[in-house]
Amino acid sequence: MATQKYRELVTIGGKNVVLAHHEPPVINAGVLENADIFRLINIFSEKFTPSNLDKADGTPLRLYASDRVKVDVSKRRKHDMAFWHRNVDAHEIIFCVKGALKWETEMGTVTMHPGDMLFIPKGIGHRSMLCPDSSDDNVLLELKIADDLAYVGEPK
């Protein structure tokens, strides 16, 4: 019997199942249906330019969408957000990838730097603003998630 070389952990319904592979899982020439779903994109590319790059009333650019989740890229560069936003349909999780922006919310004000993540609950008014640490490239990823979320990531 051949030696197990590769292990795969599959999570189904909160349970983990371990599968043994004798060939690398990356060798999979048989997957053709929905092959376009597996995609690498560079959010710094100029082709992903949202209207909020240089417009105060501009909005982020939608990259992915489903009924329950949306993924946007934001590149606010020149102007503070000219309006307050209140998403009553979804929580918003904001990841700062590059640069820095200040977020005013009904719950308080924070300044985000690369590596920071901000959770804005459904229904909370907010807006982003330039700050002293902002650069010519302030890049954020924004997830809009309609499902209820519970924070489970407390570091040990």
Locations of regions flagged by a protein language model:
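Short histidine-centered beta-strand/loop micro-motifs
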Residues: 61-65, 81-88, 105, 129-131
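A short hydrophobic beta-strand segment most commonly corresponding to one strand
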Residues: 119, 134-153
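Short acidic-glycine-tyrosine-enriched beta hairpin
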Residues: 106-122
